[in-house]
Amino acid sequence: MAGKSNKSKAKRAAQSTTTNSTTDVKSDAPAPPVAATVPATAPVTAAAAPVATAAAPVTAPDNGTLTAVDSAVPEANEVAPTIPKADESESQVENNDAQPKQGELRLYPVSVKTQSGGKMELQLNPGDSVMDIRQFLLDAPETCYFTCYELLLRNKDGETHHLEDYNEISEVADITIGGCSLEMVAALYDDRSIRAHVHRARDLLSLSTLHSSLSTTLALQYDAALNKVQNPGDKPKSDVPELECLGFMEDVPGSLKKLINSTSEEIRSVENIVFSSFNPPPSHRRLVGDLIYLDVVTLEGNKYCITGTTKTFYVNSSSGNILDPRPSKSGFEAATLIGLLQKLSSKFKKAFREVMEKKASAHPFENVQSLLPPHSWLRTYPVPDHKRDAARAEEALTISYGSELIGMQRDWNEELQSCREFPHTSPQERILRDRALYKVSSDFVDAALNGAIGVISRCIPPINPTDPECLHMYVHNNIFFSFAVDADIEQLSKKRPSNQMTEKVSSSEKVSCTEGTCDNEEHNNCNEAPLVENEQATYASANNDLKGTKLYQEADVPGLYNLAMAIIDYRGHRVVAQSVLPGILQGDKSDALLYGSVDNGKKICWNEDFHAKVLEAAKLLHIKEHSVIDASETVFKLAAPVECKGIVGSDNRHYLLDLMRVTPRDANYTGPESRFCVLRPELITSFCQAESLEKSKFKTKADEGGDDSSNVSADTSKVGDALIDGEANGASNSDQKSISDKQNTTAEDYAAGSSESSKSCDQIAFNPNVFTDFTLGGNQEEIAADEENVKKVSSYLVDVVLPKFIEDLCTLEVSPMDGQTLTEALHAHGVNVRYIGRVANGVKHLPHLWDLCLNEITVRSAKHILKDILRDIEDHDIGSAVSHFLNCFFGNYQTAGGKASANSSTAKNQKKFFGADQPITKKGQGRGKGKASSKKSFSSYMMVDSNILWSDIQEFAKAKYEFELPELSRTTAKKVSVLRNLCQKVGVSIAARKYDFSANTPFETSDILDLRPVIKHSVPVCSEAKDLVEMGKVQLAEGMLSESYTFFSEAFSILQQVTGPMHREVANCCRYLAMVLYHAGDMAGAIMQQHKELIINERCLGLDHPDTAHSYGNMALFYHGLNQTELALQNMGRALLLLGLSSGPDHPDVAATFINVAMMYQDMGKMDTALRYLQEALKKNERLLGPEHIQTAVCYHALAIAFNCMGAFKLSHQHEKKTYDILVKQLGDDDSRTRDSLNWMKTFKMRELQMTAQKQKGQAANAANTQKAIDLLKAHPDLIHAFQNAAATGRTNALNSAVLGETQPRGRGFDERAARAAAEVRKKAAAKGLLVRPQGGVPVQAMPPLSQLQNMINTATVSSEKGGENGEAKVQEKKESSENGKTENLAPAGLGAGLTSLDKKKQKAKK
């Protein structure tokens, strides 16, 4: 951080890591106590209830969607008073004598005298550091361009304290007593700080750091429109424009360009600011304080040469090629560069003010930089012009890969381990420790990313250049790099040319070296196909190593350390980046090896002190202490995998490395090719909890003596099912269910049972070395018992977890939208992706899930093949190779010889394409300059065509996932969602234009715009905040809004301090805070929190991530709750666009969103549009889920309500009858929802009878007037013909429109299928004697021509009566819907599972 000059350079290295190179900006001060956290919004008057309230309260499932459920949460009016509003917060805080809860911070006002002499005020906490204050000042518009200053603190007594950067305020003075003030005093610049000042000035002048969200733009446009309408003389818009959702859902490829937000137009304030070629200052000028020279060209066209000194910036007299350091005649100078430019140029002053106003108008989170931004697979099309930018060129040329880095490099390992040694006994100490760890780890990942690109691009030389290339290792910026090569492709390429299909090439035989795992004596010949056993860091095991490292980091055992680690996939290569182990590069590491083995168990090292530390971690990770025998028949007691390496570094710390098998091997995969198929840690946790709960239940029943033991075993699968629900808290589409939902017990009972069984849970441990080649010690019974334990948990995965996961998918308890969320759901349940083939076979009957699994298998198989292509091509062929691959994958590219077939020439092409003639250990040789290109033709990748590629994909899927890809997979893959998935997995960015997937070659080389690395890392998470969120979710599910609000607020405050606002977990907190405020009736507060979540999701997850789509959907519902329906519909349109890109139009969440859109139009009275969306939702659910699924019943019920609002009570009764039939079949007669549906049917039937009776009464009342009117008309025959012509014309047009479906224009954005569906409904209604008017009027009997005259005469009276009747029906309907909100599901209120979300939770609540 460029703040001070020389005074803070000698601080502790461990502390400097928390603030060095700080790029994350706090958007606001840490959250105040709960009472003060509720946004201070104006009271909402006449706010209509949200869509969901007509049917049911809304609760918060784990993916953040609003879902209609029954009364799991009390009504808002019952709980709203428990959450303090903004106007109550001050008095409540003053009267609260209790200590602040964890994560809550008391803020105190402190005045600041700025460097320019102005005054401002900050809200500070005694625990804030001086660096925090500097960051606050850097964010404030008044002080944002001051970077080099000292801070002085004056207390109430007049004492002055100089603040060092790493001081906490509480260490210097007590600001809680008041009367304290801060003063910014100019400090002297040095070479580093003045360059940082110039860099800061450039950033301030650019809007590139402003990431505007579409939600913000929509809100600003809506407010502007409202203000315009409120002006005198302006007429308000009478209608809300209809969305084009149904249209673009049918043209997803055409909507790609809509995803990219239009970037903010740059406001030019200066032509350029560049470092002058007079730099560096000559020695005699250095002696008088010159540090830097800048060349500036203003918008007026004036050129200035500016001198930066230790004190000021001024314009010198240089005009040509000779430096004239004297100040110019104008004498302009200032303490900052921005201040000087404001004096030099009036246009700069105006533009700078506009830039600052633009940034100030944005949401604070939009100005915050994300530490690890996601990869964007779409780029602006047409590609914007690339303009000259001297400053950009300077920054690009300062990147150093191979040369010596300027200045002192960061010692990542020392920083990381020092942060881990921070004290963490008090909550505030834990926050500071977590913050330091997060910052160091994030900086490491960023540095590893740049270093890996340099390694793969051959910009960084290896440290062992004389070794074979497959063994090359690299060190750059104190980070160790090594390659991990995937040999799954070799399995395919070697099987075909050899024609020996009986011998399988091991999928785990992959080549690479990690730090300290190479044995050069056994690698003199890299051409040998057999692989050396101790080369462990293969493509697959790198993932396992990363997972093991995370587990030991979470265990956090004092005295046991792990290296920082990241995995970078780029251009087909997988690079493993690790912090450098102290002393490893200076000597032989075998001398320091104290634990584990470097030669696969031939020699095992053991140390008592090391074993004690490892054993402590093993108890937390369910690893059993067991015996292993080495080659010398010596028995060792280990509590870790044999191949792990315990090393004491030169810093005397105990490091544990190579943690590929922290969890036991999967007993379902025991072949030699599956030695790195291990179980996931989530599964181990779930199994241990299930086992301990079963034991505790058995003990309880034994104590009661009332049950036999057979019941216990019968409950095993139920216990497992319940635990799976609890584990899948990150990917489930419904709220996390406790085991009590499955066992008919209360949450308190489960908590008590969990505490009782925690001890037995910890006692469950597994031997990680069973089913391996290592020789195990102990007797045969013990070894058999260890193997049986692993077999038991493997069987638990196949027999309990997988069936339960498939069941959750089918019932929409878990509803993944794309490949990423499917993978997250699998992992959250403890299921490895290699089981995805079994999942696919289990969901064949559901088209959307079948396609999702099918496409994920296809994309994962294609990813490995594309990576193999990228590994073997040169830099200049990347764009054409990627476009050719996409054409073969999505198009129908054929080689010049015609259609390819599985003959010998094809096999030869395949062999050449995959490089099968190259030995496995030569993979990655493309990194060598010119080595590969000399041995293969220029366009070897052009030898493949669509048939060859798909044949390889099918074979890969069969070998890797044990799944036979059907021929249909080529057709189902022609989707934007598949293209998106593939691009994200490989790191490809393409142009955002419409692609014709029916063409043979849909892609061109110019469509490939970028190739970025894909990264996996071990950045720690804040476990305390995560636990608080889980507790808050439990409270929210039980309706305890005030308590849940407290938990979520505490978690939000902690995460803000640890990670800053740009983090996924912060978004989760904002989502749940929005849910709580929504339930409490504070719509404006809910929108404020939801807006935060949306911005964070866009920045941290991506513009088109499913969570981002759900955020837009929830935002729309909140806006609708404030009667801002136009803005709500715009957000719904964005949600549908994103859902179309991520999942495609065929997904139940899309149907649920259609229902929500229909409810909005229904509340606006646009019944024709509402019916179109409801009909389309019904068709989707019937096609995707079946005609008897509960979600289909939801659609029928929504249609029944819509027809009821139109007065078509007969149609309402018919649709509700279908709802009732489905619920009876799925839930039974006794279920509350079934009874509710029956009540609705009775209500609709009663209203139909009432309407008929009212109609007959009206006809009788008007009978007497009829004759009088006829007599009148007989006296005026000319009126009869006029009335007859007018009535016949109007009626004929209306009937034709209803039958033919011509009531909507056939234009852009109009869905003809929906129109035909709506027309069909009207046609059937007309056939039954009803005319359903598109305008939502009351249906009237289709009159024969002879009765037209009487109908015309009575039009006014009958319409009046019917209008009143219909109006009463609508009011009554709304009232009853509101009254029955707890039990009657009008429609799902969000993007999710809808009616089925919390079935068992609701049943429990009713019990």
UniProtKB/Swiss-Prot annotation:
Q: What does this protein do?
A: mRNA-binding protein involved in proper cytoplasmic distribution of mitochondria. Together with REC2, REC3 and FMT/CLU, contributes to the establishment of the cellular volume devoted to the chloroplast compartment.
Which superkingdom does the taxonomy of this entry point to?
Eukaryota
Region described as Disordered: spans on this chain: 1-36, 83-103, 724-760, 1358-1407
Q: Where is the composition biased (Polar residues)?
A: 14-24, 730-747
Asked whether the keyword Zinc is assigned, the reply is: no
Similarity comment text for this entry:
Belongs to the CLU family.
TPR repeat residue intervals? 1025-1058, 1067-1100, 1109-1142, 1151-1184, 1193-1226
Effect of gene disruption? Answer: Causes mitochondria to cluster within cells. Reduced proportion of the cellular volume devoted to chloroplasts leading to an abnormal chloroplasts distributions. Lower levels of chlorophyll, especially in plants lacking REC1, REC2, REC3 and FMT/CLU.
Outline the extent of the Clu domain. 384-670
Question: What is the protein's given name?
Answer: Clustered mitochondria protein
Asked if Endoplasmic reticulum is a keyword of the record, the answer is no
Record's signal peptide: none
> Where does this one sit in the cell?
Cytoplasm
Q: Name one Pfam family in it.
A: CLU_N
Q: Which UniProt keywords apply?
A: Cytoplasm, Repeat, TPR repeat
* Compositional bias ranges of the Basic residues kind: 1-12
Biased-composition ranges for Basic and acidic residues? 1362-1382
| BP GO annotations | chloroplast localization; mitochondrion organization
